Amino acid sequence: MSDIKMNQTTLGPKFEEALLFANRIHAEQKRKDSGAPYLAHVLGVAALVLEDGGSEEEAIAAVLHDAAEDQGGEEILAEIRDKFGEKISQIVRECSDTLISPKPPWKRRKEYHLGVLKSALPETIRVMQADKVYNARNLQRSLIEHGPQTWQNFKGGREGTLWYFRQMYALLSKVRSGYLMMEFARLIEVIEAFPLADSDSEEPDERG
């Protein structure tokens, strides 16, 4: 019987700095599915990365993965590069579906991002796998608590979101298998099994 491989990662001052940076950058943001402070999301993604065997560098990138996309584009990315280095800034760039404002249409952004991830760093793939598992878990919880009206908070609606999840699973699992992808596949099946929203064919809400 083989020994269980334990993650030997330790978190130092740079990780603490990333937490403070993310808290400042996302201070005014809330999660669309729960209203929780947005920092809860990046902390959850970082936790999944570390539990998956990720390095401190990957955990820092997880904490920062939405900073440029949501809060300042290239300007914030340059700040991340200055504070945390080129490698982490590249991971954050590859985790972003756009760095421009106003953002392009939802479907176009997602298609673009899928293309970017085909040649992304291995570290980016781990962060994105953790991000998708976290998002799918929260979506499942929202569907349990609020039912089909949950989809009103998503720009892609039910069909668009499931399309995106399936495409992400196909791409990410091809690059890297393991628990996160098994969990993502399970969550997609669970989400698909929830009843259709009566308003699913209507124009989606723009809050997503």
Model-based region annotation:
Residues 2-208:
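Active-site helical microenvironments for divalent-metal-assisted chemistry
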